[in-house]
Structures are given as structure tokens and as C-alpha cells.
Amino acid sequence: MPRRKRNAGSSSDGTEDSDFSTDLEHTDSSESDGTSRRSARVTRSSARLSQSSQDSSPVRNLQSFGTEEPAYSTRRVTRSQQQPTPVTPKKYPLRQTRSSGSETEQVVDFSDRETKNTADHDESPPRTPTGNAPSSESDIDISSPNVSHDESIAKDMSLKDSGSDLSHRPKRRRFHESYNFNMKCPTPGCNSLGHLTGKHERHFSISGCPLYHNLSADECKVRAQSRDKQIEERMLSHRQDDNNRHATRHQAPTERQLRYKEKVAELRKKRNSGLSKEQKEKYMEHRQTYGNTREPLLENLTSEYDLDLFRRAQARASEDLEKLRLQGQITEGSNMIKTIAFGRYELDTWYHSPYPEEYARLGRLYMCEFCLKYMKSQTILRRHMAKCVWKHPPGDEIYRKGSISVFEVDGKKNKIYCQNLCLLAKLFLDHKTLYYDVEPFLFYVMTEADNTGCHLIGYFSKEKNSFLNYNVSCILTMPQYMRQGYGKMLIDFSYLLSKVEEKVGSPERPLSDLGLISYRSYWKEVLLRYLHNFQGKEISIKEISQETAVNPVDIVSTLQALQMLKYWKGKHLVLKRQDLIDEWIAKEAKRSNSNKTMDPSCLKWTPPKGT
């Protein structure tokens, strides 16, 4: 069968101008004497492709025109002859009845001049094939006999035209888009149904697993409803308090807040003194049965109020983690070391650390606690420990009191050890950015000695030449030694070095959350001790800074936090609050770890030259 040529208008984008997905035929009697008719056939596929090119440009209004002036011209243009022109008039095919002769189509060319002259008789142009076209008695829908063949042709042509366009390629699923596909909760025996927050139907992590927290999905939903109800009541009471409260400079607590404080004090008085024998047996049985796959039983360990507060914090943290997972900011199982075997401890990591890729893909990392070398398996670690001769950090021991020692390690002389120490610290610090460039720093490593060696407690790093007088660049206490007073000892030791150097020091910003809490506590203790021993009437922040080696900015911020700094009659006054001093003295008397202090007489150190 001979192939028919296409009759199309030349558009600026190089495609045939057509707004319909049917085979059209048009016979014009007024042009039969002057213009030879040319036959063309437009398939569904070519019509769809031309339609997609025309949809991007605004459609001009179809104008009526008079018969005495020719308003169109037919022209035979092939695809290879089409050239883009800056201004091309819009063309629309006219539908008419199919004649028994040949299949023909003529394209009407509306010029801008004629559309302006006939603006009073405008009509809406035909829309897309899915839209509504102007209906008339001569409109006939013609279907192609080879629909599947036409669709395959259109698909092939569209792939060729969009070969260089990446937007036409199938989009790859990201983690958060395929989060609910082929995933399950890692807790043994869990079917991934329910969520700790009570707001989701499924979960895929331990943080949102009701079974891990010894709860059921229904119990989580009931607790969520109770929390929402309490939040609504609290918001309503806050609105009432805001309406009744005047905008004063010093606002006293409201009656509702005072009642709530008394209620909390009464609830905490009901705390059980200890566990009974039956409860201890129950807890031990639960621990032996489930091990680390379930959360330990927490009932009767503290007051009901504190336990409920802890449960709320758990649910809120789980909700925040769920949002981060859905946004793709947390990808579980990809380049994340979950645990490390460090000496006799197994530590859960908090953050990602840039270990080499072959180690970062492991879920568990094995590490020598003396030389800090990291390994892939328990066998490699056992063989290494049999040959490792290190029993303490490298460098000079500059402090020793009892079993506590501090070693000064130069990052230039012991580069590998300091790099491994930084990689280890990044597992527990979020804002740490120093990993490999350790040569300009000194590292002060605190250890605790026993018959097997000196075990790492924590460390802090310090620039050799700090122009801003930073006495700490990075500080870390190992998780197994936290909440035992060692962090405050490291901070005190850094200020002890500043006193020997006769400088005023301050930690480098930004501080981590735990670091800020530790430093606030240390500054508070230093100021209260100084005010307790001070007997004069006038005090100077500069004198406090010179005696304690604490930066004046840190002193002022701590005084403001304690509400001990006031402005009165054009002067700044430091108030000596005896109630805070008495409270601090009582806490100092109750502390059992009185040996967790740094003794300046045990320091054997001189400042390095050039600092």
C-alpha cells in the first residue's frame, strides 16, 4: 500500500499543527478552481505528539471570517523542510463530513490582521483531545482501526524525542518514598503493627515498636488519646492565664502553677523505697527471657509521675524520629555503625562517624581500648590483643592521683592514635568536624588504671596556638563513665592548665547539648564557691575571671541564669543569693564522690614553648 504524505502547517517547534486525535477530511469548494487538493493522513500517534507540543503555547481564539476574503492558505510541508520562525500564525484543522473519495485535510491559517478585524465574532478554539471542541452538525468522531499500532508508534516516537530529557525517564524511588515497602520491625516476634505514638498503623524501627516497650498497639492508642486530651486542657489553661496576667517585668507564678508544683511534690513523695523480693524476681525473669530485645520493666523504680513523664518523652522522640525517616533524613542500616565492642563494654553509638567504607557498612565494630585500632571481627580483635603491647595512651603522663591519670598526646607525634580518637569521639558527638587534621592540636586523655592497664575515661583537645584563648576545642566523656563526675573533672583540668599558663580560657563554640549542661553546672559551682568564700562588700567580674580563669562572658551569662545580676540606678549589681549558696553547700555535703576533684599539686606540667 503506498504511503500517504502528511499535510501539516509549519509550526515554530517543528511539529505538525493539529488539535484533534482523529483522521480528518475536508473539501473546500471555494478553492477548487485555484488550488490543487493534496491528500494527507494524520494518525492518532502523530496527533498526540503534535498536541503535546502545542499545549505549552497559549491557544489563540478562533475568529470568524468573511467568505469574500481568503483567510487561509494550504501548504505542503514535510518534517525535514520545517524551520523555526520567530512569528508563526496559529492553525487549526476544520472538521467536516467524510466524503466517499480520498481522505483529505485542509488547515486554516488565521493571520493576526484578520483576527483583529473579526474580534467581534470570536469563538473559543478547540481544546485538547480530552476537552470539549466546538460542536456542529458536521462534527464526526472517526476512530482509527489500528489503535494499538498507533499507540506503539507514538510511544517509540516519544522515547526518541525525549532521549536527552531526564524528566521522561522513570523516577527512582528514594528511601522515604519506599519506606513502607518490604520492611519489618527488627524486634523478634513483632508483626510491625501499631506504633508507640498511637498515631500510625505500622512501624519499622525499635523506637516505635510497642512490643519492645512491653505494650500493645491498643494501649498505645489509649495513651495517645489521653496525652492529646491533657495537651488540650493545658493549652486552654494557658490561654486563661495569659488573659489574666498583666505584662509586668517580673512575673510571679500563677495559682495554677503553684498547685501543680505542690501536686508534683506530693506524687514524688509516694516513691517506693525499694523493690520487693517478688518484683526483683519478676524483673530478673523478664531480663533472662528477652535479654536486649525488650525494654526492662520500669514499674516501681520511680514515682508514677516521673514514669509517666518518661513515657511521654519516649513517645515524642519516637514521633520526631518517624518524621525524619519519612523525610529521608534518617536511613537505617546504611553506613551506620550501631554498636562498638570497646574493652569489656558494648556501646551503642549515637551519630555517624566517617570510618572507611568497608568498616562503616558493618553494624558492629571491634576496637582496642588501648591503641584505639578498629577491626571487623572478634577473631581479629582477639589476635590483636594477644600481640598489642600498649597498656596506656602514648605521650607524657602529666597528672596522677590514685588511679586517675592524664596523658598529654601531641597530634603531630602520634597522628594515627589521635585520628582514631577523633573517629571514636564522632560516634558520640554531633557537631565534631575534626577527624584527620590533628597536627595543630594537643590531646589530654584521662584514664583509670587497674591491673590490666589504663582504661579510657574521656579526653579533650586543645589548639597549640589559639588566638581566641580557647582552652578546649573538643571534649568527650565515654558513655560508660557518664554521670559519675568525670566530665566536670575534665573541665576543671582544662581551667587548671589555663591557670598555669596565666590565661583566661573558654571552650570553643558551638557546644553540644551535654557539653553545655556540663559547663553550666561547672560555672555555677565555681561562682557559688567564690561567693561563699568572698567576704568583701564590692566585687569585680574581672577579679573573678582572673582568679578562676573563666572568661568574663561566661561569668556574666551564668550570673544572669542564676538571676544574680541586676541593673539598679545606672549600675550593675551582683546579688549574693544565700539560698542558692546554702543549697549548693547541702549538695556538696551529700556527695559521695568527693575524690572526683582535680588536685593542682598532682600536676607535673609546664606550658609548651610557643603557646
Curated annotation (Swiss-Prot):
Zinc fingers (CCHHC-type) by residue: 176-219
One Pfam family matching this protein: zf-C2HC
Record entry for activity regulation: Histone acetyltransferase activity is inhibited by GMNN in the context of a complex with CDT1, inhibiting histone H4 acetylation and DNA replication licensing. Selectively inhibited by WM-3835 (N'-(4-fluoro-5-methyl-[1,1'-biphenyl]-3-carbonyl)-3- hydroxybenzenesulfonohydrazide) inhibitor.
Polar residues bias locations: 96-105
EC number: 2.3.1.48
Binding sites annotated in the UniProt record for acetyl-CoA: 475-477, 483-488, 512, 521
Glycyl lysine isopeptide (Lys-Gly) (interchain with G-Cter in ubiquitin) cross-link site: 338
Active site residues of this protein: 508 (proton donor/acceptor)
Entry protein name: Histone acetyltransferase KAT7
